[in-house]
Amino acid sequence: MNFAAEGYNSFETKKTPSGVIKYLPDPKAVIGLIQSGKLKEHILLVQGGTTTFLAPALSMGAIGVITMSGAPESHLGILAREFQMPCVMTAYLTNSDTRYVTGGNNDAHFAAIIDALEGKKAQLHCEDRETGRVAILG
């Protein structure tokens, strides 16, 4: 299987959710997705592991999350484990050398990930203890 991105795995699971990746930059986007009734059709892409505004989506049945920063010990990593929801954290593109740098300017890194993943049908693979992976389908 060809993996477009990988990162830290928030917890080991055999669940392999698939859906269209949707970037959620702010609380308004989260509420809009919930109100659309299409939450369970999407894997959620967010900037950080401290993205607390994503909590309503988790409790309403989100199927999976990809973060561009943050660690399994972050707020979102803990919530993902609590909700038993696959979550790939601090994702990076496997065909790129760019990586998230703590305290650095990561705008280009974030933009590249959003551009490469948003709107793509994907499947999360979190069966490895340490590494979560994102496969693009079709």
Which sequence ranges carry the predicted segments?
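Non-catalytic, soluble scaffold/interaction modules
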Residues: 1-69, 73-74, 78-138
